[in-house]
Amino acid sequence: MSVTIPQKDNQSLNKAGMGNTVRIAGVDEAGRGPLSGPVVAAAVILDPTRPITGLGDSKALSERRRRELFRLIRANAWVGIGIAEPAEIDRLNILHATMAAMRRAVARLPVRPTLVLVDGNRLPPGLPCPAEAIIKGDAKEACIGAASIIAKTVRDDLMEQAARRFPGYGFEGHKGYPSAAHKAALETSGACPIHRRSYAPVRAALESRFSTNANRCG
């Protein structure tokens, strides 16, 4: 899965009172908990001359408002997207895959940040500048809130695309999270190529289907 985010015009982001040009990137992710689909990270550098009101935790926003803010962020900020696919999540584990996605998001910013603020209590290794982890940062720092909005919106769109590729799982509704309907579809249809086979509910569904098929053969 690949995502292209149109960028604003290349211009300096000057933070008042700091003297030198300062580019602060907020970083957040979406999709650690689902049983299927990628984890998506976003890095956003806001332009202080183009303020955007209402930025915050994407989970606290209605879908309509989140998409309005998504369009505003794309038009008025620099954005980088990083993705870790299900196979990478299974190979590395979700924590390390998330760190990789965050690092890619920062690397794909069109300008290099001077400081990175990451939501949570861990920092991805290999960032190109000083960084700080902020617990509940999406509610405290506008740039992290913006990254939260970008990451969730991009991931939701990817899961809606997945729903068309793999009908019957309801990805357009639950977005891969472990809802009752999703678990029932797993039991009925088994895992599809975007399921995370290292996750216990997916593994249990696969083992159950294997056991059922083995009993039928026996």
Curated annotation (Swiss-Prot):
Pfam family, one: RNase_HII
EC number: 3.1.26.4
GO cellular component: cytoplasm; ribonuclease H2 complex
Domain annotation RNase H type-2: ranges: 22-211
Record-level Gene Ontology MF annotations: manganese ion binding; RNA binding; RNA-DNA hybrid ribonuclease activity
One GO biological process term: mismatch repair
Main location: cytoplasm
Subcellular location as annotated: Cytoplasm
Cofactor binding: number and manner: Manganese or magnesium. Binds 1 divalent metal ion per monomer in the absence of substrate. May bind a second metal ion after substrate binding.
Record keywords: Cytoplasm, Endonuclease, Hydrolase, Manganese, Metal-binding, Nuclease
Keyword Nucleotide-binding assigned: no
Segments forming a coiled coil: none
Role: Endonuclease that specifically degrades the RNA of RNA-DNA hybrids.
Protein name, as recorded: Ribonuclease HII
Primary gene name: rnhB
